[in-house]
Amino acid sequence: MLFERARGVFPGGVNSPARALKHLAAPLVAKGASGPYLYTDRGRLVDYCMAFGAIILGHAHPRVKNAVTQQLERGWIYALLTEEEVAYAERIKAHVPSIEKMRIVNSGTEATMNAVRLARGYTRRDVIIKFDGNFHGSHDYVLVKAGSGAATWGIPTSAGVPQDVIKLTAVVPYNDVDAFVKTVREIGGRLAAVIVEPIAANYGLIIPDREFIKALKEETERVGALLIFDEVVTGFRVGLSGAQGHFGVRPDLTTLGKVVGGGFPIGIFGGRADVMDMVAPSGPVYNAGTYNAHPVSVAAGLAVIEELEKGEPYKIANEAAERLAKGIEDIAGRAGFDVVVKQIASMFQLYFKRGDVKTPQDVRESDEKLYLKLHELAIKHGVYLAPSQYETNFTSAAHTQDVVETTLAALEKAFTELKSQVGK
């Protein structure tokens, strides 16, 4: 069995905890992917994980495949400046005005790690604020009350993070203006930065109040700290200008990843020119990497952005998410379950609970066991949902109306089986 072999060479048998699917007898094994579909050892599945949001056009999109193939024919790494990376960065800058300059790295984790280091170097301060349930990758600065796989596995604060590092990270309830303002005023002139998911997509999906986002900007400006928007998930998914465009708030620094790599490894941190000019070689804040601005990732990312600029991919993906959100609530209600679905743009998540979901505590109060049972039944009927209530579902331009209706029919069967299992 492949999983047994995998456990012999990988911790837990996987290379990222979210792939373990701890509620199943064994993880899914991928065989391939195309359009909205994953091909696995359990058959073809309609994919709503979409590589945790990295894929927005659909799997193996022809335009992306062609761009990557052409780049491979020219060579795949030079460790030199290229015309393509400049054109790519100019495209991003045109759509995200807060990013005046940027550094292209290799992952969301690298992006947020460097953004925090840069904020500390620029302000000459050490303390940062992050929010309960926000996930900013797997580095020491931010692995405190984190989301995503850390929440799924019940280890939001990782072992191995020194207490001296934790002491420099203040954790505040998400979407709580009063708690945030109080904490900023307590820290005052020691605060280097506030890092936040402007739409929290790593603790389920939590859409904050506009007043909360506005307060982040006002309070950081008041004390001379930097505001970092972690848009690794939302960048170029919520729209060409991301969540900051949706809320109309301009952060000092932004991190990007996922969509802008077209399914290949990438991360970006960028923002105000005066802040970014602190990055080596123009300044004293160090960042370097053999694979920075990798030509293949840049080629894929540029192809994705050019497709998104046409508008139609967003229209299809967003309409799919809207239809699924409404359809799932209706199906769950007919089956006798209290379910609320949160949705924005091409992201959605469902929770087994009554009432709204506005905070991480609301997510924790949802019935995780029911979600995991539904997830397993959905696979049985050909649908792959996000593997935990602490993750988010994503649609793509390949999730056409027919695919959505097929999905809803499959989920109706899954909810009917769930009802019989739990005795409703």
Curated annotation (Swiss-Prot):
One of its GO terms (cellular component) is cytoplasm. It comes from the Archaea. It is an enzyme of class 5 (isomerase). SUPFAM superfamilies: PLP-dependent transferases. Its EC number is 5.4.3.8. Its main location: cytoplasm. PROSITE patterns: AA_TRANSFER_CLASS_3. InterPro entries: 4pyrrol_synth_GluAld_NH2Trfase, Aminotrans_3, Aminotrans_3_PPA_site, PyrdxlP-dep_Trfase, PyrdxlP-dep_Trfase_major, PyrdxlP-dep_Trfase_small. Its cofactor is pyridoxal 5'-phosphate. GO terms for molecular function: glutamate-1-semialdehyde 2,1-aminomutase activity; pyridoxal phosphate binding; transaminase activity. It is found in: Cytoplasm. The modification N6-(pyridoxal phosphate)lysine is found at K258. Keywords: Cytoplasm, Isomerase, Porphyrin biosynthesis, Pyridoxal phosphate. It catalyses: (S)-4-amino-5-oxopentanoate = 5-aminolevulinate. NCBIfam families: hemL, PRK00062.1. HAMAP family: HemL_aminotrans_3. Belongs to the class-III pyridoxal-phosphate-dependent aminotransferase family. HemL subfamily. This is Glutamate-1-semialdehyde 2,1-aminomutase. It comes from Pyrobaculum islandicum (strain DSM 4184 / JCM 9189 / GEO3). The gene is hemL.
